């Protein structure tokens, strides 16, 4: 594991920001006071949505967060917004799409709408199919400057097939052609959830909503490169920051809850030395 040094990043002459560190603060306040324009390569976060997640009684100011994220994101940078919708009286809120439209309104491109599909979701509904997914909106500031596609084996990996190849004599000649061994993944990503699926860090589940470490890693590898800055403005128990650090990216983790920041710090202690 590459051990990154803590680097001073002078975004505010009065408050030098240290990379690879956690901060207890309200994220809009933190961004306004500490992060320069066009300085973040990738933001990966999962905000509290509707009233499904009780976030220690704190207020979630979505519009201000979105505006600040646009300001601090580099040209070509990406924001991955992992979010779901409340279902009340059989009616989905669609808050996720309302938020996506607002991101688009303030200047982001909606580069992709991806699906985080949960393999073993415990939630059952009596009069509808089990709700087992969340959205992963990929917003970009212009065209993404980085895309490292994740590959997966093809169904017919290593097989050959006969194809018709018309030669100079205008006759079809059948030739063997080896099929591609791998392909780029689709935008529906499947993950097991719960202890052993989401993470093996038991302390992480003191936070009400933890997404899988592999999900975080897949996005970090896709939309950033080594040495880039990965930001999580609502870092909770620190999954984004942990996986950024372990993949040789710099991270900034912010959360308004001191309790959650302590959990995040403890998860990284074994790696940071």
Where are the regions a protein language model picked out?
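Core catalytic lobe of class I
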Residues: 1-265, 269-271
